Amino acid sequence: VYKRQVEYGLKPFTTDGKEISESDLVRQKKMDNKFGGGVFSLNYTNHRLTASLGGGINQYRGNNFGKVTWVKNYIGALSPAHEYYRNQSKKTDGNIYLKASYDLTGGLSAYADLQYRHIDYTIDGANDKYDWNKSALRLLAVDKKFDFFNPKVGLNWNINSNHRVYASFSVAQK
C-alpha cells in the first residue's frame, strides 16, 4: 500500500527528475507496557457479624511508538529506527471497601458493601493518525481524575435450605 511520506515524518525525494511523495514502506508499531499493583483485606467474624475491610491499587504505564524500517527507493537519510510517533500513558486505579453482614434473627441478615474508587489517567504525545488540516500527527493530551462511590445495602432471608429471598439497593460506577 502506498503511503504519503509526510505522514511518517519523511520528506519527499526526487528520482529521475520526478518528486516522489508517496511510496511503499514497512512500519512497526510497538508497545512497551508495564503493570503492577497490590491488594489487601482484613477480616473479622463473630457469631452475628462478618466484616471485611480491603482495597487495592494498581498502575499501568504504556509507551506506544511506531517506526519506519524501510521505504521503497528512498533516497533521503533514513535511520534504521526512524520513529514517526510516540505517546505515553499512565493509569493509576485505587480503591478501598468495607463490607459487613449482620445476622438480625434466625434467618434474616442485613448487609452493606461500601466502595470508594479513584482513577488518575494521563496520556501525552502523538498518535499514529495524521491530521491533514494541521499538517501534523494528532496530539494526545489527557489528564483526567475520576472518583466513584459505590454503595450496596440489602437484606437476605433464608426461608429454609432450599429457598432464599433477598432485596438490595446499589449504585455502580466505573
Model features per residue range: what roles?
Residues 56-58, 82-174:
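Structural signature of Gram-negative outer-membrane beta-barrels, strongest in the C-terminal barrel
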Residues 21, 37-39:
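Long amphipathic N-terminal alpha/beta scaffold segment
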Residues 50-52:
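A structural preference for short, pocket-lining loop segments at secondary-structure junctions
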Residues 27-34:
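Flexible loop and strand-edge segments within Gram-negative outer membrane beta-barrel domains
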Residues 66-71, 88:
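Small-side-chain secondary-structure face that scaffolds active or pore-lining regions
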Residues 10-24, 70-81, 124-136:
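Flexible, solvent-exposed coil segments and beta strand-coil junctions
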